[in-house]
UniProtKB/Swiss-Prot annotation:
It is a lipid-anchor. It is found in: Cell membrane. Gene3D superfamilies: P-loop containing nucleotide triphosphate hydrolases. GO terms for biological process: protein transport. It comes from the Eukaryota. Intracellular vesicle trafficking and protein transport. Belongs to the small GTPase superfamily. Rab family. The keyword Transport applies. This is Ras-related protein RABA1h. InterPro entries: P-loop_NTPase, Rab_GTPases_membrane_traffic, Small_GTP-bd, Small_GTPase. GO terms for cellular component: plasma membrane. Keywords: Cell membrane, GTP-binding, Lipoprotein, Membrane, Nucleotide-binding, Prenylation, Protein transport, Transport. GO terms for molecular function: GTP binding; GTPase activity.
């Protein structure tokens, strides 16, 4: 799998959302993945923005439409529209601020309340380059991820550590779910989903196929 540059040429379009407390680095994760850019002066996101990037998974081109919003309470009114149609999510906390991990449970509940049970969720511990300031152990989060059946990875948007891996893993897992559902339905996965259609991962009875905890910490 790898990067694919022609943005108008793709087989699948997946909506992925970033969620978590304000200031954990969601916007910089997005800009690092989509533009290979990092801003030291990144202010809290106002409202909602999204960016896109296409990658190759197997022999298919997967286009990600990645949405980013501020984690501040005053923006919670946009929740329903923000999550609608999402088939993947990166739930981000800051490894140097324990309160951001404490709030993960609330963000996870909100995410699950507004998305399908098959939505691929990656728990992301950002700012892993600041290991000397670490406030949350990798093991603590790994245990939580196993309990909640989510994926888990630690990243550094600043140093571009695991950012590519985190997004690519989420997109690959979504693709696997969609392909499996098409095959289970007796369809050819290459023709079951028209090009350009926003993908919905569907029913709630197939959760075990997706939610296998994994940890790729730095």
């Amino acid at each position: 799998m790898g990067t694919y540059k022609a943005e108008d040429d793709y087989d699948y379009l997946f909506k992925v959302v970033l969620t978590g407390d304000s200031g954990v680095g969601k916007s910089n994760l997005l800009s690092r993945f989509t533009r290979n850019d990092f801003s030291h002066d990144s202010r809290s996101t106002i409202g909602v923005e999204f960016a896109t990037r296409s990658i190759q998974v197997d022999d298919k081109i997967v286009k990600a439409q990645i949405w980013d919003t501020a984690g501040q309470e005053r923006y919670r009114a946009i929740t329903s529209a923000y999550y609608r149609g999402a088939v993947g999510a990166l739930l981000v906390y800051d490894v140097t601020r324990h309160v951001t991990f404490e709030n993960v449970e609330r963000w996870l509940k909100e995410l699950r309340d507004h998305t399908d049970a098959n939505t691929v969720i990656m728990l992301v511990g950002n700012k892993a380059d600041l290991n000397h300031l670490r406030a949350i152990s990798t093991e603590e989060v790994k245990d939580f991820a196993e309990r909640e059946n989510t994926f888990f990875m630690e990243t550094s948007a600043l140093e571009a550590i695991n950012v590519e891996n985190a997004f690519t893993e989420v997109l690959t897992q979504i693709y696997r779910v969609v392909s499996k559902k098409a095959l289970d339905a007796g369809d050819d996965p290459t023709t079951a989903l028209p090009k350009g259609q926003m993908i919905n991962v569907g029913s709630r009875d197939d959760v075990s196929a997706v939610k296998k905890s994994g940890c790729c910490a730095t």
